[in-house]
Amino acid sequence: MTTAPATTALTVLDMAQAGRFAEIHELFAPPLRAMVPPEALQAAWAAEIDRRGPVTSVGTPVSEPTGPGGLVVVRIPVTFERGELTVVVSVTGDGWLAGIQLAPASAAQPPGPWEPPPYADPGKFDDQDVMVGSGPLAVPGTLSLPRQGGPLPAVALLSGSGPNDRDETVGRNKPFKDLAWGLASRGVAVLRFDKVTYAHGREVAKDRDFTVSDEYLPQATAAIHLLREHPAVDAGRVFVAGHSLGGTIAPRVAAAEPSVAGLVIMAGGTQPQYWAAVRQVRYIASLDPATAAAAEPTIEAMTRQARTVDSPDLSPATPDSELPFGVPAPYWLDLRGYDPAAAAAALGKPILIVQGGRDYQVTLADDLTGWQASLADRPDVTIRVYDADNHLFVPGSGPSSPAEYETPQHVDPAVVADIADWLTTVQTEVPSR
């Protein structure tokens, strides 16, 4: 029997207070473990204790189901000796942790219901529930289908790392729902779907040989086929749009499925993920110089683990404890051997690359330069930078931080408009049928 989400969240808080961060890490849904090491949890908690003093009381948790897939977000108000905050724990339908945040005290109550962005017109399209793929690892999704009639251009959305739902819910934001409704309002059919690590996290966790290809390719290929076979869709204009790790993997998807007409790469990384994680932890630590020293042991441990992945001695037998975040070697062997920019260059398909200027997770200097080096001289490749946007393509000012994601906002209308214009006008060479 699955434990109630509120009980799970309170247990996690108890573990944090007792310093049992390795046990919390074991509760993470795979491959979320590839994003947040136990040392990072410990450093974040230690920083709050240094800043606010010991915990003096724990309030009543508030649970919020977030829609299809069974994800529940639990918010626990916590009072410290010198302040308050909210511990936000996301629990999947089968009991895994999909995320932990130390949020401001104002986040103790759930946000209001998601509201459509101004650029979405629900009267111009219909949302339809679909199943993507077949067999035990099929995943539920939503097809946003314009009412204007076909043949329509269409796009399948690939979300980033971790157990993402079809809306790519991050904090109080739903960037994929924004994007889907915005594109459908402009005449593009959009298919978004729960990741296999979200819909079937417990089954995936049993597979030690699980790779990045397993994480994306089966459902992405099925989504492309679903769109190509839909009577309202132009089979010669079915695209893939990937965000974050989904953008990194999009060229591999297109290589595996030649019917893909082109790619939209949204903040896709070209720096290896295990080194990007080190950079991100260092950046987050720099936002608060008073507690930056607490992150140094985490950064040193992550650096050692990243070097192990790069080592020629890495093999399937390498102990999990020596690898980033305890994720088994097959995942890293697959990811290490993949060069996304080279894969994109080999495709010979039109590509739109969009990047936020304030993004600290995927950056101009560390990642966009990789795409530019391989693709900038290609006439069928368009690269656009939105200076004010963060990793979710939400505009803002000043240094970006994880706290931004707790503020309900919408994807930049300029990004949605540019993607829609590109999808509806780009020249493709894939036969319609």
Give each language-model segment a name.
Residues A108-G150:
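N-terminal cap/lid segment of alpha/beta-hydrolase-fold proteins
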Residues L157-E215, V394-Y405:
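Cap/lid segment of the alpha/beta-hydrolase catalytic domain
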Residues D209-H230:
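Alpha/beta-hydrolase active-site loop
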Residues L347, I353-Q355:
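Short beta-strand/loop motif that positions the catalytic acidic residue
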Residues G262-A346:
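Accessory cap/linker subdomain of secreted extracellular hydrolases
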Residues Y360-D366:
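Conserved alpha/beta-hydrolase "acid-adjacent" motif
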Residues D389-L392, S397-R433:
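Catalytic active-site module of serine/aspartate enzymes centered on a nucleophile-bearing elbow/loop
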Residues T7, A22-G69:
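Short solvent-exposed beta->alpha transition segments
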